[in-house]
Amino acid sequence: MVLKYLLQKEWLQIRRNSFLPRLILTYPIMLMCVMPWVMNMEVKNIAVAVVDNDHSARSQQLVHTIAANRYFRFMGEASSYDAALQNVEQSHVDGVVVIPQGFAKDLQQGHTPHVLVAANAVNGTKGAIGSLYLSQIIVQAVMPEAQAIREQFHSYILYNRSQNFKLFMIPALFGIVMMLMTGYLPTLNIVAEKEKGTIEQMNVTPVSRCSFILSKLIPYWLIALLGTTMCLLVAWLFYGIVPVGNIAWVYLLVMLLAFFFSSLGLVISNRSDTMQQAIFVMWFFVMNILLLSGLFTPTRSMPAAAYLTTYVNPMSYFIDAMRTVFVRGGNFGSMFHQVVALVVIDSLMGFWAVMSYKKNG
């Protein structure tokens, strides 16, 4: 019965805040509309210049092949390698292809010509992938038998057949939505009451710690369900992406992650005295959890010490499980490890949240 009145108090506080309801409604929509386009990690628009020292029909055919490729932005032909290198130094060009003199003659005589590919490696990923793309095109032009072998080789792409990067990224964005809605908002809640002095009135009442903590968590869990529904609708309406698996798993995983972030937020707010202190501490944890979760880079590519943190990072388990539901349509058996890990981490964090709240006086 006490919990009921505490929840009514929390809802009244949320409704009285003119900014908070707008944030709850607009943040998931804006994030799902903008971030899938911004966080596209496919390497495209690689600026390429060509130095053709042969000026033959075969060399021009290679130049046209490079210019027609959708991954490249052809910047024209340079008069010499030094001129092309100057464009690289000025960041106008990402890669240079130098076709040697006698390119066509070597091909006619059955020799393999030496074509130079120079890539700007300031952006290591773009330079490496760009040089790989160029090398594949040159090999196909120099060795026609390689193209014949490629035509005989058939590959079958499982699950994400269109190789749509948004299908890979959108499930992970649910975690960012939960991070704000159930992480930051509960963090600022108790600290705001401390600054206003209303928390002292609560401390002198016979309300138990569990009831008080639940009254702070439950409203944001319901907000998390609303945000999840909005994200699912945006993913369906704007991108045509729906979970291949049971949609109930999406809500279960979201609630598990929401429990962790809301508990973490309460731990921080119980230990903080000012709003500024709570925001900076929460920002520290959020950035580390996000960067080490595998959202932006594969966890297997991390150094060994950083990879060990993924075993205690709930966001890492959440992203793996959500991608399983959306892309592969997995069942509980395929997500058992992730779900159990989230439950264990949530239990520890929830216990810490309850124990961190102490009545003063």
Model regions: which residues?
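Long, hydrophobic alpha-helical segments
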Residues: 166-188
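Structural signal for membrane-spanning alpha-helices in multi-pass inner-membrane proteins
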Residues: 31-39, 179-180, 227, 231-235, ...
